[in-house]
């Protein structure tokens, strides 16, 4: 019953997704949201604001392809969405799967609140946030990220 208490106490689990906290600025000078989403290796997760989020009747539309995907690789979806292990502050219902074609290969990409999720190639160290740029690319603050109905 203490899992998620006060937004600070969580059971030790092998999470696929984490919510980290950071208060400094990125090299580009964009303010970093205090909480932000990472994968289990600590890589920051981003959304591209030029993408169109999924709705209850439409799939997402990604504006990132080819060279863009080299710099911003898609976060591959797990074989079954139900296998995501999340902290209590995140809801499985906010995640989805988007099937896209990249270089002639079908890839299943994880989505959050309808938006396809990406990593930034230069962000190799846990906690690196060089991809957070006001406007185009945003590290995901789960509490503030636009809610949609996937």
Each language-model region and where it sits:
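Compact beta-sheet-dominated domain cores in extracellular/mature segments
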Residues: 1-150
């Amino acid at each position: 019953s203490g899992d998620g208490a006060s937004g600070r106490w969580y059971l030790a689990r092998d999470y696929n997704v984490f919510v980290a906290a950071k208060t400094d600025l990125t090299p580009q000078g964009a303010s970093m949201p205090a909480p932000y989403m990472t994968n289990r290796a600590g890589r920051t997760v981003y959304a591209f604001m030029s993408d169109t989020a999924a709705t209850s009747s439409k799939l997402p539309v990604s504006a990132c392809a080819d060279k863009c995907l080299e710099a911003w690789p898609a976060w591959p979806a797990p074989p079954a969405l139900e296998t995501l292990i999340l902290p209590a502050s995140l809801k499985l219902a906010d995640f989805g799967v988007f099937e896209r074609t990249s270089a002639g290969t079908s890839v299943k990409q994880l989505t959050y609140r309808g938006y396809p999720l990406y990593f930034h190639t230069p962000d190799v160290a846990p906690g690196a946030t060089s991809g957070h740029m006001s406007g185009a690319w945003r590290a995901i603050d789960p509490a503030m990220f636009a809610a949609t109905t996937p």
